[in-house]
Amino acid sequence: MTAFGVEPYGQPKYLEIAGKRMAYIDEGKGDAIVFQHGNPTSSYLWRNIMPHLEGLGRLVACDLIGMGASDKLSPSGPDRYSYGEQRDFLFALWDTLDLGDHVVLVLHDWGSALGFDWANQHRDRVQGIAFMEAIVTPMTWADWPPAVRGVFQGFRSPQGEPMALEHNIFVERVLPGAILRQLSDEEMNHYRRPFVNGGEDRRPTLSWPRNLPIDGEPAEVVALVNEYRSWLEETDMPKLFINAEPGAIITGRIRDYVRSWPNQTEITVPGVHFVQEDSPEEIGAAIAQFVRQLRSAAGV
């Protein structure tokens, strides 16, 4: 039976980016293996996966701006924490961390859009990409599971503010609802901590669903996703697709599409969306094997 550790992995470190303090984990030595979370999580999501990669490289996991232990933006409002603003902060942090030229990316949720985008811009610096429950193509509402479609349509309406900023729906309902097991109180409190204060401190959890590329909107995010997916569907960059069963956002036609990408290995693990909380051992072992194969092929 899988043991689900509750303690964070590693020791948090901090760097100032554009006047704001950003938190990250940076453990071990060697070529970088970069783990990137999405909404509404943090580097805490990777706590039971990163130990499987010890000894295989430098393990880096950053908290997005306004999330985890990173600072909040001020003043805040509906125009803050857009994809573009999140990207500017994260890419500046990655640049400051000097990740080197043999990066392996491990991506989930919005961390996948950010990582795919970065990889597309730095193709000669990425050795391979592992991804799960990722944003791989623009979507339509028909692609969304009926059980959550209404909630996400609500986030993208004027009701989004009370849903997310007052009632903390993304943390209190969406997160636990997309995990097969029940998180402990201690685990939930780690995820609650960045958003314990109501109002604008919770803005990132609302801006992210409003940035999802659904039915052609927002146009700039749709264009960006089309740009990186056009590259991913033709590049021989080694890929590891960690398929979730039953899954949430990579299902049906989108799963079929992802399976067309070249030079890709696939494993299937139990999970809905936050698969790291249901299958950390299987995911960690698969990524470790993937990295060993990449390093061996590169003669490292």
From Swiss-Prot:
<comment type="function">
    <text>Catalyzes hydrolytic cleavage of carbon-halogen bonds in halogenated aliphatic compounds, leading to the formation of the corresponding primary alcohols, halide ions and protons.</text>
</comment>
<protein>
    <recommendedName>
        <fullName>Haloalkane dehalogenase</fullName>
        <ecNumber>3.8.1.5</ecNumber>
    </recommendedName>
</protein>
<comment type="similarity">
    <text>Belongs to the haloalkane dehalogenase family. Type 2 subfamily.</text>
</comment>
<dbReference type="GO" id="GO:0018786">
    <property type="term" value="F:haloalkane dehalogenase activity"/>
</dbReference>
<feature type="active site" description="Proton donor">
    <location>
        <position position="133"/>
    </location>
</feature>
<keyword id="KW-0378">Hydrolase</keyword>
<feature type="active site" description="Nucleophile">
    <location>
        <position position="109"/>
    </location>
</feature>
<comment type="subunit">
    <text>Monomer.</text>
</comment>
<dbReference type="Pfam" id="PF00561">
    <property type="entry name" value="Abhydrolase_1"/>
</dbReference>
<dbReference type="InterPro" id="IPR023594">
    <property type="entry name" value="Haloalkane_dehalogenase_2"/>
</dbReference>
<dbReference type="InterPro" id="IPR000639">
    <property type="entry name" value="Epox_hydrolase-like"/>
</dbReference>
<dbReference type="InterPro" id="IPR029058">
    <property type="entry name" value="AB_hydrolase_fold"/>
</dbReference>
<dbReference type="InterPro" id="IPR000073">
    <property type="entry name" value="AB_hydrolase_1"/>
</dbReference>
<feature type="active site" description="Proton acceptor">
    <location>
        <position position="273"/>
    </location>
</feature>
<feature type="domain" description="AB hydrolase-1">
    <location>
        <begin position="32"/>
        <end position="155"/>
    </location>
</feature>
